[in-house]
Amino acid sequence: MVIGIDPGPRESAFVVWDGERVVASGDLPNQELATYLDSACSSVACEWIESFGMAVGREVFETVFAVGMFSQHVDRLRLVPRRDVKLHLCQSPRAKDGNIRQALIDRFGEVGTKKNRGPLFGISQHRWAALAVAVTAFDLPTTDHEATFHMPEPEPAA
């Protein structure tokens, strides 16, 4: 299983993906998601922020801070850039959110309804990006531009 995260400055979307269907998903305040990750025994992948040479505001830095906080709650955090997700799911670096959403629906089926749940039931808004990260991380052992953060082992006391 893979937990995919679409990080935000105060709240982040997450999806737990088992390779065939969404097991759990939600939007949580960042501190609550970090606590949730403490008990996660799955692989964790997070969309990584990329610089395109443009000025950024406070929200971008708060989002990067949240990703750092998440990294402190897991043994290994895969940081998957959006461009790698686009290339994997749509075979184009120019894909937009709608293209990614459609690629996921084409591959796995409709979201469905409460009475007739599809494999992507519960996915909406930022959870689409979290699902895209989870599927990419599940499918590929590594991507071209990703980084990995490992928590260092504590040094023995002297």
Where are these regions (language model features)?
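Phosphate- and other anionic-substrate recognition elements at nucleic-acid/protein interfaces
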Residues: 1-158
